[in-house]
Design a protein with these regions (language model features):
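Bacterial N-terminal signal peptides that target proteins for export
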Residues: 1-9
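Short glycine/proline-rich, acidic loop/turn segments that cap or connect secondary-structure elements
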Residues: 187-196, 220-230
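Bacterial N-terminal signal peptides
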Residues: 10-18
């Protein structure tokens, strides 16, 4: 993840921006949302920050995890991304970054900041002929699929190449999102047969919505994939990098070598 190092998150959740004591309404707090988090995970982050503010700063913010989740559920996506099928998920639009807020800041106000930042960052993405929402969905998958910045455009290429050939994407992260299965719990045979539209083993094409809130590098990678013919990738034993190939046979060989089933 770029921009925010995971090991620094705990220390950076709440930043003291004023050197002297001030009335609660004037206290400045900071929340950092890392790239690739879901709305639910962002709501959990809000709850964590609130507890730190209460116990370390002796301030009780109006903002809560529950109010953030509720506001996100009723917030409309930007007009340019409204869908003909009436889906209104805000997932993908809550831009990951650091945000300042005060004790009286509401969830709707924080979300408005995130949407404003999304708009500013999105304008930096040159879409070419690709559909904006498709690019955002692909960016969210890139964010969840690789931790290595140099692999973003390669993962993007695999996704677009498989779509062009009418191949199922077969991305576990989409199924986990659809079923709410955490990353530390193995997918079961029952999970893999689930008919959720987020099951990209069973359903061709993109999932219905983004599966996370991506940062700018993943958005740019989604819009500009690497010019390679790769169709497969498998995670290496370091759990960070992947082996990429255009050959199913080579993919299966590497998968077996790394201890996975093909």
């Amino acid at each position: 993840v770029t921009g925010v190092q995971r090991g620094l998150l705990a220390a950076a959740l709440v930043a003291l921006l004023a050197a002297t004591a001030a009335p609660a309404a004037d206290v400045s707090l900071k929340i950092i949302f890392p790239e690739g988090r879901t709305v639910r995970q962002m709501a959990d982050r809000v709850s964590q920050v609130r507890q730190i503010a209460i116990h370390k700063r002796h301030v009780t913010p109006v903002l809560t995890g529950a109010s953030y989740a509720a506001a996100a559920a009723t917030t409309e996506p930007p007009a340019a991304f409204r869908r003909a099928d009436t889906r209104k998920s805000i997932e993908g639009f809550l831009f990951p970054a650091g945000y300042l807020f005060g004790a009286s800041t509401t969830a709707s106000e924080l979300i408005a900041q995130q949407l404003q930042t999304f708009g500013a960052e999105w304008r930096k993405v040159e879409l070419g002929t690709r559909k904006p929402y498709d690019v955002l969905v692909v960016a969210s998958m890139i964010e969840r699929e690789t931790k290595a910045p140099e692999e973003r455009k390669l993962v993007s290429a695999v996704i677009w190449n498989r779509l062009a050939k009418g191949m199922p994407l077969g991305i576990d992260a989409t199924l986990r999102y659809g079923l709410g299965v955490p990353g530390n719990r193995p997918l079961t045979a029952k999970d893999l047969r689930d008919p959720t539209p987020y099951n990209t083993d069973l359903n061709k094409g993109l999932p219905p919505t983004p599966i996370a809130n991506p940062g700018l590098p993943s958005m740019q990678a989604a819009a500009h994939p690497a010019k390679v013919d790769y169709l497969y990738y498998v995670r290496k034993p370091d759990h960070v990098h992947h082996f990429f190939t255009a050959s199913e046979q080579e993919f299966c060989q590497k998968a077996a070598e790394y201890g996975y089933h093909c």
